[in-house]
From Swiss-Prot:
A Pfam family: DUF188
Family in the record: Belongs to the UPF0178 family.
Full protein name: UPF0178 protein SAR0734
The organism's taxonomic lineage, starting at the top: Bacteria, Bacillati, Bacillota, Bacilli, Bacillales
PANTHER family named among the record's database cross-references: UPF0178 PROTEIN YAII (PTHR35146:SF1)
Amino acid sequence: MTHIIIDGDACPVVDSIIDLTTETGIFVTIIRSFSHFSNQLYPPHVSTLYVDDGPDAVDYKIVQLSTKDDIVITQDYGLASLLVDKVLIVMHHNGKIYNSKNIQQLLDKRYMNAQIRKQGGRHKGPPPFTKQDQKVFEKSLLRVIHRIKELD
């Protein structure tokens, strides 16, 4: 059964994912570090798992829990690269789907930007997340959900 796992520490589309999966039978797990603790109540199909605050603790837990039928939502290219061949789909919160062809290019870009920073340079970060970005993500996730439901 398909399950969505969210890298929840800095994901701006958690509410969208919850809303879009409410009537689908798809369960959602939000994985966060304790430093991002929330008392927010979620619907029955949503669970929250908290892990220690250590570096990459959330990532390690996601890798540990994920299976071939899962959809993982993350903006972390390193985590995505570990999951691309393990899970059904890995998505960015901008709606783009990571795959074995584009992940290496994204990792290379991340490495080059780190080298620029190491030398004292700067590069432009991502623009702020907008309502339009959220709509693009929602449309992309709905396409994925419909494809999965057709296969069931």
